[in-house]
Design a protein with these regions (language model features):
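Acidic anion/phosphate-binding donor-loop and adjacent secondary structure
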Residues: 155-175, 189
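Conserved donor-binding/catalytic core segment of Leloir-type glycosyltransferases
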Residues: 170-186, 192-195, 204
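A short, well-ordered alpha-helix in the C-terminal region of glycosyltransferases
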Residues: 298, 305-319, 327-331
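Acidic donor-binding loop of glycosyltransferase active sites
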Residues: 238-251, 264
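Conserved acidic donor-binding segment of nucleotide-sugar-dependent glycosyltransferases
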Residues: 280-290, 298-304
Length: 334
């Protein structure tokens, strides 16, 4: 049996994204092989307080350790996330079941990891697991440079049965539209500057719960979209042509993969693991605000080039399909 220790985050709960959806999908395909334990990371979980959260994780770890049989494996989906207490989980399993294979997913950018742990603590935490699994080569390199060698580079999945392009993807009659999504390691001040310099282009700024309205005050070409249901967000994606990603870092993300699956041309910061997911056939790589402005204008004025990038985004998204991720996971666990 492969035991999956997963978390239900409010931001992705019930959506076709996130680790919970991924591993529910995997469990449904192979219920005799996978069994998932899910912690609710909404208010109910946090209201338990630090001690209560630890107790919940501790008892689950003890229960599974006592039930362990030779051949069983463990997947931890939020390793090195302090609120998950998965280091505690791994310690317990490793102490009671020293030969148990433990695969621990790490998908926070280095800046966030360093806010939570010293480099020595990260290196020590790697000793409790068989393999650390990342979603991008830049994070793998970062961990390798800390002296952590047991790292496997996977990729971020997308459910391209749900995230599909609009029927009129290549023959839009209206003006080009740009969508901005995601908050992790995003530079909203630069985004506001770009929007201000392109008054002829309309932008959907999907800000979620970020308090950034003041940055776009007076910009009539920007529609600010708060936290909305997944179907509504997909509507905005299907009404757009370009996915704009002004990032300080990326190690693989829902935004990049879902944007490609809906056939959006990618205009992205050339940082982190972005080239694991995009190349020059579907993306314009940028290193400054003026780069972004120039590339968006080029695409807005050249529909043939824009459609070419859209087509290649769709093609590349197939590589990161949820079914390909399932196959990759099976290979890792062998």
């Amino acid at each position: 049996m492969v035991y999956i220790i997963c978390y239900d985050w409010p931001s992705t709960s019930g959506n076709h994204t996130g680790m919970r959806y991924l591993y529910e999908y995997i469990q449904k395909r192979n219920p005799e092989l996978y069994k998932m334990y899910t912690f609710n990371m909404g208010r109910r979980f946090f209201d338990k307080g630090k001690k209560g959260k630890k107790i919940s994780v501790l008892f689950t770890a003890l229960k599974l350790a006592m039930a362990y049989k030779s051949g069983d494996k463990f997947i931890l989906t939020e390793y090195l996330h302090r609120d998950s207490y998965q280091i505690l989980f791994a310690k317990i399993i490793r102490f009671i079941c020293p030969k148990a294979p433990i695969y621990a997913m790490v998908h926070l950018v280095p800046e966030k990891l360093e806010r939570r742990y010293s480099k020595a603590q990260m290196k020590k935490s790697s000793r409790f697991v068989t393999e650390i699994v990342t979603l991008g080569s830049s994070l793998t390199c970062y961990l390798n440079n800390l002296g952590i060698e047991n790292v496997y580079t996977s990729f971020h999945y997308v459910d391209n049965n749900y995230y599909t392009p609009s029927a009129n993807l290549y023959n839009r009659s209206d003006d080009v539209k740009v969508i901005v999504m995601g908050a992790l390691a995003r530079d909203f001040e630069q985004i506001a500057y770009i929007v201000s310099r392109l008054p002829q282009i309309h932008f959907y700024i999907c800000k979620g719960r970020e308090n950034i309205d003041y940055l776009f005050s007076g910009l009539k070409n920007a529609t600010l979209v708060g936290y909305v249901p997944e179907a509504e967000l997909k509507h905005y994606m299907n009404d757009s042509d370009i996915s704009l990603n002004v990032m300080k870092d990326t190690i693989g993300s829902n935004v990049i993969c879902t944007s490609m699956a809906t056939g959006l041309a990618m205009v992205v910061s050339d940082v982190g693991s972005i080239r694991d997911y995009c190349d020059e056939t579907n993306a314009c790589f940028c290193s400054s605000p003026d780069d972004f402005i120039e590339k968006i204008m080029i695409l807005a004025n050249d529909r043939e080039l824009l459609n070419s990038l859209k087509k290649m985004s769709l093609k590349k998204a197939q590589q990161f399909s949820i079914d390909n991720y399932c196959a990759s996971l099976s290979s890792l666990l062998k």
